[in-house]
Amino acid sequence: MAQETSVEQAYALAQAQYAAWGVDTEKALLALGNIPISMHCWQGDDVGGFETAGAELSGGGIQATGNYPGKARTITELRADFAKAHDLIPGQHRINLHASYLDNGGSYVERNAITPEHFQTWIEWAQSNGLGIDFNSTYFSHAK
């Protein structure tokens, strides 16, 4: 209860400061609710991807974590993190997947051999959760 009151008080102060600049924060929040945000896959697993179990970037990652000790370790855990974020962030959003986040069924696939079929489970999951998907090829930390 005290935390909620503190947040409400902080928002009221911020709202007054923005109003002094002619900004209606309630209108801004309503507009923001109509702007899709693309949540990047690497925010939940420190850019490891799912090419190989326990993958890490050569040179390290960015220390982003999800709802698991260290980082999401599986596609299931990363999807759960995406779903939780989607529940907490108002509006309709998208996920952004790099090629290294393919669902390879446990078999290694070279990046130059990845096909759309490697993302079918992601497509089905996103559709069932009302999310769009943006795609990035992965041209770093890999020879091919």
List the model feature ranges, each with a label.
Residues 2-144:
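Alpha/beta catalytic barrel-like cores
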